């Protein structure tokens, strides 16, 4: 079976068992503060599992694209070194929300593997939770009894809490699980060692392929367990491992999931996969990482230096580094693999082809940028090695190696490889200590203590913010969080007009008011689609009616800026072309930011045209047309624009202002006239193929215009209220340029005369012409004089000049090449003498400069240079 046939067979099987087949959620997560990426199939169902929302379907199945770069078996630096771990992978899964449980989950897993896929039963093993006395948990005898209907007892193994008790996090739903393992060894190997001795022993041919999680508990903040009201089945099967098993391969990379990409890489590198272990590792790294990078960009995450973007950049750079080091790829190459990836996976994930141009451009620019950084890093490593050799050492410090890692993306193994080639080593203990310090810093910065939810009353949350900014409500539950030595409280309300941060729009602020007190809401966030109201103070009376009141001034400003982004999007399409797609946005009360796909700088003329179009739509005062709970197919028929990387349900909200029609959950003005006016204040590049416009609206435009007018008035006053300010400024610039030229010519004449005087006054010491002086000249003039002197006296010349410019002392030393060969070094001399002017400096052996703070020490510094030179 091909990979496509296997994926389709899984969906068909569970569809026949009454499961709703749902599309994969985006790999990039936007509304869960605990995760950056989808790392399991259950992520998109977290709200249901946590009880925040009811399940639309009781039974669900899908194939989910996932990304893991940490955790059990997922150290990024190990990917590529074995044949079955990946960063990006597909997870086949089926779920039950309060419907079937262990019996059906185990029975259907067996039916699919054995009856549909025809896997030999004697090669299968199942693990069950052995229990935990300290938790008061018994062995999962229920699961074991169901497995005994299919497997002999020696194929049913007990597993410890680490392997067979699944937990969502430190708190939340959890429960025992059953792993299904398959033994793919030869019959001879099986005869020598039984498979049950190799389960969970990291044997490359005895691997886990499916995990059946039976969620039946909730882990509280104090570590105790309580039963879940509705039990959940959550299963996940590694697609790549399953394909490998069914295609009879010993490596995931030998399957049709990876082979087309590996062949393309080998062709680029002029090699063959399977002939050289180090090259094979490099090719596996690249084949794995190109999938991760392409899907991440498709789902809206560009490489960057922060958070999720940094993870993607790190993965991309790791792949480039392997290509550079082991496959001779000194130019950008990964972007050329995209057509092969699309041909291989584009049918299952059409968004890849839809975003092809953007993905290629982003990857290519990132590669080229890192290759430049790599060259810089190599030069720095060369200098570090030379300094160590000069000091008689064969080891560089771990601190230097960590700087290379942290600043230039040099993993330790690349540094070690280059050092080995030069007969040197690195202090790994120091490097590891620096790495540990960085991890501690990151851990402390991100540390959050989250308490249990305290329930005041049962119920669901209803958002009423599209229609109301004040609404009567009550507190359903709350919890305490501690972060960065600050205690905050998160509150869930029964009904809320507060918009929770999402879709680029910041969350509402305001107050909740009862007859006893007023509590300030400092922010509103969304956690798995649940609005969370954040406050510094918990109400003393939690079970009384309250009024939730949004800050209407901030809300109105946000609404104006959000509606403006829609008009801006439409105008950009008109001016630049239909290739323009939104790639991100930020809507605050103060301003708006809009990122979009475009492959060159937007000209000033184009920006002006866009701004005029938007302002024309504002003046038209186009009323808002809003569609709520619209079936997604109907929304598409309307022509509504959806964003790549966003997850939409079966029903959506659509916002329309004339020709601008978009899927959107944000708050908007009732008519475009409420925006007032827009002014674009900047346009810049975010990444390859992605531009950014920043703009302001309404009162902020008035403030800007006032500032501009004030500046204009000040300029007019400076030019005596000249009738034509532009002409007056041009005349001033021209006159200034003329005067500057006169000064330069005067300084040249003065410098020439000074140079002649210096040559005349030069002293000869032991055959060396020594030019020593202190002059009131700028650093540039002194430098010119020094090089002119060298031109006139090419041998046996030693120049030391002290100068003062704007009360800042400067020391300049120039030495002829023959004296340098004899052992003189201007850089070393300057560094030592600069201490006398309270400064520092350096340079090359033949020319160096130093600046300082103490002009009074200049004479002593000049004499010190002569003394140190020992002429």
Swiss-Prot record:
Note accompanying the cofactor annotation: Binds 1 zinc ion per subunit.
Keyword vocabulary terms for this entry: Aminoacyl-tRNA synthetase, ATP-binding, Cytoplasm, Ligase, Metal-binding, Nucleotide-binding, Protein biosynthesis, RNA-binding, tRNA-binding, Zinc
Coiled coil: none
InterPro entries, alphabetized: aa-tRNA-synth_II/BPL/LPL, Ala-tRNA-lgiase_IIc, Ala-tRNA-ligase_IIc_anticod-bd, Ala-tRNA-synth_IIc_core, Ala-tRNA-synth_IIc_N, Ala-tRNA_ligase, Ala_tRNA_ligase_euk/bac, DHHA1_dom
GO-annotated cellular components: cytoplasm
Enzyme class name: ligase
Cofactors: Zn(2+)
Reactions that this protein is recorded to catalyse: tRNA(Ala) + L-alanine + ATP = L-alanyl-tRNA(Ala) + AMP + diphosphate
Gene Ontology MF annotations: alanine-tRNA ligase activity; aminoacyl-tRNA deacylase activity; ATP binding; tRNA binding; zinc ion binding
GO BP term (any one): alanyl-tRNA aminoacylation
Record: residues binding Zn(2+): 562, 566, 664, 668
Compartment(s): Cytoplasm
Oxidoreductase as UniProt keyword: no
CDD domains registered for this protein in UniProt: AlaRS_core
EC number: 6.1.1.7
UniProt-listed SUPFAM superfamilies: Class II aaRS and biotin synthetases (SSF55681), Putative anticodon-binding domain of alanyl-tRNA synthetase (AlaRS) (SSF101353), ThrRS/AlaRS common domain (SSF55186), Translation proteins (SSF50447)
Keyword Zinc included in the entry's annotation: yes
Function: Catalyzes the attachment of alanine to tRNA(Ala) in a two-step reaction: alanine is first activated by ATP to form Ala-AMP and then transferred to the acceptor end of tRNA(Ala). Also edits incorrectly charged Ser-tRNA(Ala) and Gly-tRNA(Ala) via its editing domain.
Free-text note on domains in this protein's UniProt record: Consists of three domains; the N-terminal catalytic domain, the editing domain and the C-terminal C-Ala domain. The editing domain removes incorrectly charged amino acids, while the C-Ala domain, along with tRNA(Ala), serves as a bridge to cooperatively bring together the editing and aminoacylation centers thus stimulating deacylation of misacylated tRNAs.
Family label: Belongs to the class-II aminoacyl-tRNA synthetase family.
HAMAP family on file: Ala_tRNA_synth_B (MF_00036_B)
Name listed for the protein in its UniProt record: Alanine--tRNA ligase
Gene it is expressed from: alaS
């Amino acid at each position: 079976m091909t990979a496509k046939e296997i994926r389709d067979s899984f969906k068909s099987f569970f569809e026949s068992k009454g499961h709703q087949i749902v599309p994969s959620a985006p790999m990039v997560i936007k509304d869960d503060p605990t995760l950056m990426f989808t790392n399991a199939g259950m992520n998109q169902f977290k709200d249901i599992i946590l009880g925040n929302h009811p399940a639309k379907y009781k039974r669900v199945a899908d194939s989910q694209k996932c990304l893991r770069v940490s955790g059990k078996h997922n150290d990024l630096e190990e990917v590529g070194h074995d044949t079955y771990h990946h960063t990006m992978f597909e997870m086949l899964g089926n779920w039950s929300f309060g419907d079937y449980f262990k019996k059906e989950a185990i029975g259907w897993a067996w039916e699919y593997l054995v009856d549909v896929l025809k896997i030999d039963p004697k090669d299968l093993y199942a693990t069950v939770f052995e229990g935990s006395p300290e938790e008061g948990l018994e062995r999962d005898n229920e699961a074991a009894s169901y497995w005994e209907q299919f497997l002999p007892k020696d194929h049913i193994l007990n597993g410890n809490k680490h392997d067979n008790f699944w937990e969502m996090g430190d708190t939340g739903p959890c429960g025992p699980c059953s792993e299904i393992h398959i033994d793919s060894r030869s019959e001879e190997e099986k005869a020598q060692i039984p498979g049950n001795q190799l389960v969970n022993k990291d044997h490359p041919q005895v691997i886990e392929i499916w995990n059946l999680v039976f969620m039946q508990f909730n882990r509280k903040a104090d570590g105790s367990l309580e039963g879940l009201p509705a039990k959940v089945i959550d299963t996940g099967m590694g697609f790549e491992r399953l394909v490998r098993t069914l295609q009879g391969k010993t490596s995931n990379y030998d399957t049709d999931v990876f082979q087309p990409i590996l062949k393309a890489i080998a062709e680029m590198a002029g090699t063959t996969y399977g002939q050289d272990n180090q090259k094979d590792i490099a090719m596996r790294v690249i084949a794995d990482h190109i999938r991760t990078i392409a899907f991440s960009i498709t789902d809206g995450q560009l490489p960057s230096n922060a958070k999720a973007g940094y993870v993607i950049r790190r993965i991309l750079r790791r792949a480039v580094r392997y290509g550079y080091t082991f496959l001779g790829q000194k130019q950008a190459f990964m972007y050329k693999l995209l057509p092969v990836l699309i041909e291989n996976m584009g049918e299952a994930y059409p968004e890849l082809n839809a975003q092809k141009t953007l993905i290629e451009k982003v990857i290519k620019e990132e590669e080229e940028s890192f290759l430049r950084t790599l060259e810089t890093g190599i030069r720095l490593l060369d200098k570090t090695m030379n300094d160590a050799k000069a000091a008689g050492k064969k080891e560089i410090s771990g601190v230097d190696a960590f700087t290379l890692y942290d600043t230039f993306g040099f993993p330790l193994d690349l540094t070690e490889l280059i050092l080995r080639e030069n007969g040197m080593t690195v202090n790994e203990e120091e490097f590891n200590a620096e790495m540990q310090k960085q991890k501690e810093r990151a851990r402390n910065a991100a540390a959050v203590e989250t308490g249990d939810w305290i329930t005041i009353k049962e119920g669901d949350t209803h958002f009423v913010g599209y229609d109301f900014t004040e609404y009567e409500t009550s507190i359903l539950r709350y919890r305490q969080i501690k972060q960065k030595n600050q205690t905050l409280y998160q509150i869930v309300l029964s009904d809320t007009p507060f918009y929770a941060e999402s879709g680029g729009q910041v969350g509402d602020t305001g107050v909740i008011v009862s007859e006893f007190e007023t509590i300030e809401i400092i922010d509103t966030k969304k956690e798995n689609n649940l609005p969370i109201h954040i406050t510094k103070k918990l109400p003393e009376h939690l079970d009384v009616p309250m009024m939730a009141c949004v800050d209407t001034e901030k809300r109105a400003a946000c609404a104006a800026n959000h509606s403006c982004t829609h008009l801006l999007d439409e105008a950009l399409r008109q001016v630049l072309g239909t290739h323009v797609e939104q790639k991100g946005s930020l809507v605050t009360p103060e301003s708006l930011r809009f990122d979009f796909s475009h492959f060159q700088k937007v000209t000033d003329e184009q920006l002006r045209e866009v701004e005029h179009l938007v302002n024309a739509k504002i003046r038209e005062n186009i009323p808002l047309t809003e569609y709520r709970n619209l079936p997604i197919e109907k929304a598409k028929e309307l022509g509504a624009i959806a964003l790549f990387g966003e997850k939409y349900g079966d029903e959506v909200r659509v916002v329309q202002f004339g020709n601008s029609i978009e899927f959107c959950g944000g708050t908007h003005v009732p008519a475009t006239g409420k925006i007032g006016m827009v002014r674009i204040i900047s346009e810049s590049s975010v990444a390859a193929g992605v531009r950014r416009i920043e703009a302001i609206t309404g009162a902020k435009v008035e403030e800007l215009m006032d500032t501009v007018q004030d500046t204009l008035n000040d300029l007019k006053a400076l030019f005596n209220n000249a009738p034509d300010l532009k002409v007056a400024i041009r005349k001033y610039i021209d006159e200034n340029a003329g005067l500057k030229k006169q000064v330069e010519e005067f300084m040249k004449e003065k410098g020439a005369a000074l140079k002649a005087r210096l040559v005349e006054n030069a002293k000869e010491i032991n055959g060396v012409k020594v030019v020593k002086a202190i002059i009131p000249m700028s650093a540039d003039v002194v430098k010119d004089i020094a090089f002119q002197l060298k031109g006139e006296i090419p041998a046996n010349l030693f120049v030391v000049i002290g100068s003062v410019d704007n009360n800042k002392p400067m020391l300049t030393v120039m030495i002829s090449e023959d004296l340098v060969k004899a052992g003189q070094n201007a850089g070393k001399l300057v560094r030592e003498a600069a201490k006398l002017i309270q400064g520092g400096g350096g340079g090359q052996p033949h020319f160096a400069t130093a600046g300082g703070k103490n002009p009074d020490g200049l004479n002593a510094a000049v004499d010190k240079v002569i003394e140190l030179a020992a002429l």
